[in-house]
Swiss-Prot record:
Protein name per its UniProtKB record: DnaJ protein ERDJ3A
Ranges of residues in domain J: 29-93
SMART domains tied to this protein: DnaJ
Functional note: May play a role in protein folding in the endoplasmic reticulum.
Region described as Disordered: 178-201
Induction comment: By dithiothreitol- and tunicamycin-induced endoplasmic reticulum (ER) stress response. Induced by heat shock.
GO cellular component: endoplasmic reticulum; vacuole
Pfam families, sorted: DnaJ
Gene3D superfamilies in UniProt: DnaJ domain, Glutaredoxin
Known glycosylation sites: 61
Location of the protein in the cell: Endoplasmic reticulum; Vacuole
Length: 582
């Protein structure tokens, strides 16, 4: 039966159109398309592709020619990311017009063989152009195009078989659609080259299993970028590229990992992450709590946006203080040393936030902005240059750990700070151990550790994290000495100590100058303060209630008052307002 002339004519037109598309695409120099040199590394090629594909993605760029440009970019990357294809292009299809498909000289044996695959609306070309050696007769090479069936968001079918809704999809992925042996092999080869296209020198994105998550991620104090995906999800490739860029720029402050939810179903279920058509990116951070939690990233897929997101989610365990009003609190958390970073930064430095997460349950962190070293505290400790690190040991001694701290990048800075903090922590463990071993000497005066309550340390000592704040209020130096000795003795007694600060069940002790803080005292019972040289005030910040003891302050009576407050045996009065120190 003869073939109708009209059908032959239509087929001829279609084939001619396809051939023109192919020739035009192949005539473009992939190096020029991506804007890289012939000596470019795989990493350079990958970065160029990432940048251009985001710029010309049809979902974001609606200008005329963006879709065609996007196809050219993907086509160029498909060549240069595959070492075999790149080698063949350099030999036979470079911009100088050497014999080969890329130079426009088809020669003999460079013709096309058209055949139809088994899938609907799918057609294939076989060409001897040097793109991919597939074996078989004549070293025939194949690539495929799809008519119709494109991404709905791309405005109809696209002739290059790209999923324009996803720049990460495999280039020329028609291998599984057609019935051709050649096309299937080409598809497998191209899928295999996606992983090999990554530069080995790039930041390692670790495969995270349940075991690794429990051992290295969960509540370890380190911030993680975690990419959740399955082999069929879209977006993984470019997301990995962006994650690599950010992990490299924040190297030391965070780690990067990926979770295959097909293999790690239990981990993804535990994390509460379900995967649909697209990969999902989360940060595991400690922004507000002692325990880590996942926060999903929903911003643009570019390094700048993701880096900003990561910086916002770095740990915040360091309290920003005013150096002019700062003094180390003395008895907030027993046996925990305290550290203060002095820098010229207006905000808490990223490296200090990072290490505050790593040491969050082992040290108490502060930081302050300092523009010069003329402050009395800095002079007394011998600080000559900033940045500087000051520590307060468990025995109350304040010391300069290091000044003039110089680092070349974030990673080296974090390493330097970690070394300083680890050494300081070891010394304090020895101090605490030695103090525990020493016998008590009743004939020696005990060291007084009761701080003076000021505006700068009020929230730390008597803020809402504290259950009960016991204040010794004095109006003379003699009264101050007496109250300091009494409260220091009481604070050391285990029965009423109750200083579990992290759980919010702390009993804090402090002294208050009644002469200077009359406005603060006016919040409470004014009559008691007028006639007394010294008295005790028990204040519960969360409830805004208080009790006053204004009789003779002896060790026995003071202890009885504190125990009564803790046991709820004393009736508390409501404060007129929240007390404020000046």
């Amino acid at each position: 039966m003869g073939i109708p002339v009209r059908s032959l004519l239509v087929a001829s037109i279609v084939l001619s159109s396809i051939a023109l598309h192919v020739a035009a695409a192949k005539n473009l120099d992939p190096y020029k398309v991506l804007g890289v040199d012939k000596s470019a590394s795989q990493r350079d090629i990958q970065k160029a592709f990432h940048k251009l594909s985001l710029k010309y993605h049809p979902d974001k760029n609606k200008s005329k020619g963006a879709q065609e440009k996007f196809a050219e970019i993907n086509n160029a990357y498909d060549i240069l990311s595959d070492e075999e294809k790149r080698k063949n292009y350099d030999l036979y299809g470079d911009e100088k017009g050497n014999p080969g498909f890329g130079g426009g000289n088809f020669g003999n044996r460079e013709g096309y063989t058209y055949f139809t695959g088994g899938g609907a609306k799918t057609s294939h070309f076989s060409s001897g152009d040097g793109w991919q050696t597939m074996g078989g007769q004549g070293n025939t090479k194949t690539f495929s195009f799809s008519f119709g069936g494109g991404n709905p968001g791309a405005g109809g079918g696209n002739p290059f078989n790209f999923d324009f809704g996803d720049v990460f999809s495999n280039i020329f992925s028609g291998g599984s659609m057609g019935g051709s042996q050649h096309t299937g092999s080409a598809g497998k080869a191209r899928r295999g080259t996606k992983s090999s296209g990554h530069d080995s020198s790039s930041v390692n994105i670790q495969e995270v299993t349940m075991q690794i998550f429990n051992k290295e991620t969960a509540d370890q104090g380190i911030t993680w970028l975690l990419l959740f995906y399955t082999p069929n999800t879209k977006g993984q490739f470019v997301l990995e590229s962006v994650v690599e860029d950010v992990a490299r720029s924040l190297d030391g402050a965070l780690r990067a990992g990926k979770v295959n939810c097909d293999h790690e179903k239990a981990l993804c279920k535990k994390a509460g992450v379900s995967i649909g058509k697209s990969a999902r990116l989360f940060i595991y951070s400690y922004t507000t709590t002692e325990k880590g939690s996942l926060h999903e990233y929903s911003g643009d897929y570019d390094s700048k946006s993701l880096k900003t997101f990561c910086q916002e989610h770095l740990p915040r365990f360091s309290k920003r203080v005013d150096i002019n009003q700062f003094s180390f609190p003395s008895n907030i958390i027993p046996n925990l040393p305290q550290v203060l970073l002095l820098s010229a930064k207006k905000d808490t430095p990223a490296m200090w936030r990072a290490v505050s997460g790593m040491f969050r349950s082992r040290l108490i962190f502060y930081d302050a902005e300092v523009q010069d070293v003329s402050h009395p505290l800095l002079k007394s400790l011998g600080v000559k240059n900033i940045p500087a690190l000051i520590g307060r040991s468990v025995n109350g001694e304040e010391q300069l750990l290091k000044d003039g701290i110089s680092v070349k990048d974030l990673r080296s800075g974090i390493k330097e700070l970690k070394n300083l903090l680890e050494n300081f922590e070891k010394k304090n463990k020895k101090l605490a151990s030695n103090q525990a071993k020493k016998p008590a000497h009743t004939d020696q005066p005990k060291e007084n550790k009761i701080p003076l309550l000021t505006a700068s340390n009020f929230e730390e000592i008597c803020g809402e994290k504290t259950s009960v704040c016991i204040l010794g209020i004095f109006k003379s130096s003699k009264a101050k000495e007496n109250l300091e000795a009494v409260l220091s003795e009481i604070s050391q007694k285990t029965l009423i100590r109750g200083q579990n600060y992290n759980s919010g069940n702390a009993v804090a002790y402090a002294l208050l100058d009644g002469n200077k803080q009359s406005a603060f005292l006016s919040t409470f019972d004014k009559s008691a303060f007028k006639s007394s040289d010294k008295l005790l005030l028990a204040y519960k910040p969360r409830r805004g209630r208080y009790a006053v003891y204004d009789n003779e302050v002896t060790m026995e009576e003071a202890e009885r008052f504190v125990v009564s407050v803790l046991n709820g045996d004393v009736q508390l009065s409501a404060a007129g307002r929240k007390p404020v120190l000046r």
